[in-house]
């Protein structure tokens, strides 16, 4: 129980507009307060029916301590205010929970790595991975994929930063390109692949996010991700 953490970042407005990504509600996330150099983060705004997924994730967390059942349908908007520009793909907000033994976040990341044909670019503040992900990244390079990872240049946690750097050598030896964001700390959690699919969310590329935390992300396909 002590290992689990609500790491999701969700804002829903009137059931029609949703925000998610790496941002927390703190001054350093908008660089109003500088702690680790320039703070780099990402988030997405979505409109329409996809927002309902974010609403459900928020409600299940809000009511986590209650033993009573609540009808979530009463929070469902009667009408969605859709964007003026029709999307040319789809967006699927998804959640990850340590309680169901289904590593959704890890599976999304692995599927993107394994499907990549031209490139896959990754932003992550922490890089602490198991052999399954490490091998997938190196095998992607072997089949001709341009694999690049951006990590922080200035750490927020020095010990975790040292552990992150310990993974550089086997990945670089396998052909993965790793760059450090030298102006400061990159807190973004992004995967983008082949100009076709991407995900933005809260899930770090480390063991705790992939297995122990409540997380969420937004998967995008065939749109301007």
Predicted stretch roles:
Residues 1-225:
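Charged, low-complexity intrinsically disordered terminal segments
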């Amino acid at each position: 129980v002590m290992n689990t953490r609500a790491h999701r970042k969700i804002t829903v407005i009137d059931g029609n507009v949703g925000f998610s990504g790496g941002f927390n509600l703190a001054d350093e996330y908008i660089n109003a307060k500088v702690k680790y150099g320039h703070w780099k983060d990402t988030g997405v705004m979505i409109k329409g029916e996809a927002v309902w997924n974010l609403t459900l994730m928020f409600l299940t967390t809000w009511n986590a301590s209650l033993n009573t059942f609540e009808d979530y349908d009463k929070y469902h908007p009667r009408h969605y205010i859709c964007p003026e520009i029709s999307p040319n793909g789809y967006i699927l907000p998804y959640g990850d929970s340590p309680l169901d033994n289904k590593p959704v976040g890890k599976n999304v990341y692995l599927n993107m790595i394994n499907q990549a044909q031209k490139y896959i670019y990754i932003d992550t503040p922490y890089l602490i991975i198991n052999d399954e992900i490490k091998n997938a990244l190196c095998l992607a390079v072997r089949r001709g994929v341009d694999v690049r990872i951006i990590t922080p240049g200035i750490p927020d946690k020095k010990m975790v930063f040292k552990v992150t750097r310990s993974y550089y050598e086997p990945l670089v030896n396998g052909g993965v390109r790793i760059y450090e964001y030298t102006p400061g700390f990159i807190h973004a959690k992004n995967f983008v692949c082949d100009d076709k699919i991407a995900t933005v969310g809260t899930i770090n590329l480390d063991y705790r996010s992939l297995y122990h935390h409540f997380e969420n992300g937004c998967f995008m396909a065939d749109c301007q991700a």
